[in-house]
């Protein structure tokens, strides 16, 4: 497909986003509209927005490449995304969050915990962690989307990053939560349609059915590269050797880190407060589950089965054909699928990036504008909306600058860094706000501090992937990690920080609880 046709498709896509952003702007009349869609969003729109925000481009391209390299063990992440990220999140967290949010009349995650525990310090602390930590996460998505546009249209990276940022900024700043959720829903439909087509066409390309393809994938286990065998790789339909470096990376970082970390993502939690009733929230469970099964399950499956395609066409497995794991899925799509689908897949990647990024910008803007500035400088409702818009703009500028300032190896770890901190710092306090009446504000503050500092300490001094990239431990102690004894360097920080955070909130709350 030529560049002109691609350009027309992208222009039509951008015009659709512009219209939906304008629609959100027209329907936004107060701060509640801007922050939580007036609590009257359609449950289908909410569920699609939740799923589209959940699934970023890194989940499609990055984790799809991981599946191509290491196999279907990553499908456990798909299961946790569905079971924890939707079923548990909606039923056990979402219902109570919606009721509590309406009762306390709050519009953000920091406000939810701050007002529940009657502590301004809790609200400001959570907002500060979001505003300081999330730009690094956003920079990952921004850079990924800009690089993708650069490669497709052969334009300068600086130009593609600027265009990409301006488009998202326009509909987030103007349309607020309604603009974000309307565009998320469209992007979710595009992602779902692309993955559904990929799932059905994959077996036609391989000329096999489901059982035949999986048997064949099992049979080629001896072709695993030696460097991956040394890490514990046993084949594309088997889990890695228990206790091996690959096993720890898959189980602690990807399956547990991402699978559990999603429960305390502020940009996801706020979605529960956008619908009018618990009945509407329940309707979103099936839609969310079905969306994640297709979008995530299809790409992980396609990643693993791409090895059969490359063996058939090029006589080698995926990691021999494409050295860079992040480029395996785009290369496979271009080689195996029709040209028109390659163009749609490009929109799928852009949609995944933009839906995640728009929610991040909105959350950061709400944190700095409403939760921090609005707390110390109370304003009228109309003025507060404009302050939040300025907060969104400021957050976008900070994330934009980070794309240029930080080295690639640090930015590349941004997702795991932020999700790990969110899980360790926020999850115990969030759970206790919903389920444990003996939790006190002193216990929550202790948990927030312990979770945040524990995560940062583990990232800087214990977990090798981040500590090597940051270089602080090396500069201070002359080695990449403090504890070199295996398996400590490969255990995800969440397994250090989350238990300490839970312990802190339980112990301090019991010590300070008064009937």
Q: Which residues does each predicted region cover?
A:
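Membrane-embedded helix-loop-helix hairpins and adjacent transmembrane boundary segments
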Residues: 1-515
